[in-house]
């Protein structure tokens, strides 16, 4: 009976898989963005629905008014997706090459006077100095709000800018009060300077001084009671 032959295979006959390491085959390259032909075909999202190519062709007339005419891109301003940095760079570069960007020369060509002062601010009558009045609304603001410039107050020699009936009433009340106080003060001063009352006050003070001089040298309980009750 013949003996069947047995073929023995060793590990040396197989290729070493360690030579297929991904580290040896990897070559890093900078990402420069997709080209128009290589860009992945992704459906555009619009109004929470997926829009296919067929529907996009039907709605091309509507979408054309929203698309950027100067950018060859599949992005639309009506989509919910944000434009990538690559598309933005292409847009800026395209506009710069086509001369669609604003420069000093282009503004001059459009008729813009770069030396002309801009329109004054609405708060200019209140915040600027007195000689910078640019429009007559300043005087209306002064009349209605009382926000008068310091220069105007100095020229009027006034401390308050508000002029109204309530202000006049307040001035009258203040004048009446001042006159009343003046009368009271005058009456009190006149009554205190009468000769009889003045002599009585002098005599009273003289007696108090004499008692003080009499008892100031006394000591003990007697002197204490004299100084208090005398």
From Swiss-Prot:
Top-level lineage group: Eukaryota
UniProt keyword annotation of Transferase present: no
Stretches the record annotates as Disordered: 1-88, 156-203
GO cellular component, one term: nucleus
TM stretches of this protein: none
Compositionally biased spans, kind Basic and acidic residues: 63-73, 156-179
Chain positions with Phosphoserine modification: 106
Skewed-composition ranges (Polar residues): 1-11, 79-88, 182-194
Protein keywords: Phosphoprotein
Protein name: Uncharacterized protein YGR126W
Organism field: Saccharomyces cerevisiae (strain ATCC 204508 / S288c) (Baker's yeast)
């Amino acid at each position: 009976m013949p003996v069947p032959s047995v073929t023995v295979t060793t590990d040396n006959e197989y290729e070493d898989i360690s030579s297929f390491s991904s580290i040896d085959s990897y070559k890093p390259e900078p990402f420069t963005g997709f080209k128009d032909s290589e860009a992945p075909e992704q459906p555009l999202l619009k109004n929470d629905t997926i829009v296919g190519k067929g529907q996009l062709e039907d709605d091309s007339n509507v979408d054309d008014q929203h698309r950027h005419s100067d950018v060859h891109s599949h992005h639309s301003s009506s989509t919910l997706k944000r434009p990538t940095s690559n598309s933005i760079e292409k847009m800026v570069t395209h506009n710069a090459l086509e001369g669609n960007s604003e420069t000093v020369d282009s503004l001059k060509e459009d008729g813009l006077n770069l030396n002309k002062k801009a329109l004054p601010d609405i708060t200019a009558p209140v915040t600027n100095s007195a000689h910078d009045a640019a429009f007559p609304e300043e005087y209306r603001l002064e009349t209605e709000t009382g926000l008068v410039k310091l220069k105007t107050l100095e020229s009027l020699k006034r401390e308050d800018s508000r002029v109204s009936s309530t202000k006049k009433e307040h001035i009258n009340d203040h004048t009446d009060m001042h006159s009343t106080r003046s009368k009271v003060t005058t009456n009190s001063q006149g009554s205190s300077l009468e000769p009889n009352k003045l002599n009585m006050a002098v005599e009273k003070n003289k007696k108090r001084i004499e008692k003080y001089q009499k008892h100031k040298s006394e000591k003990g309980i007697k002197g204490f009671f004299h100084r208090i009750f005398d």
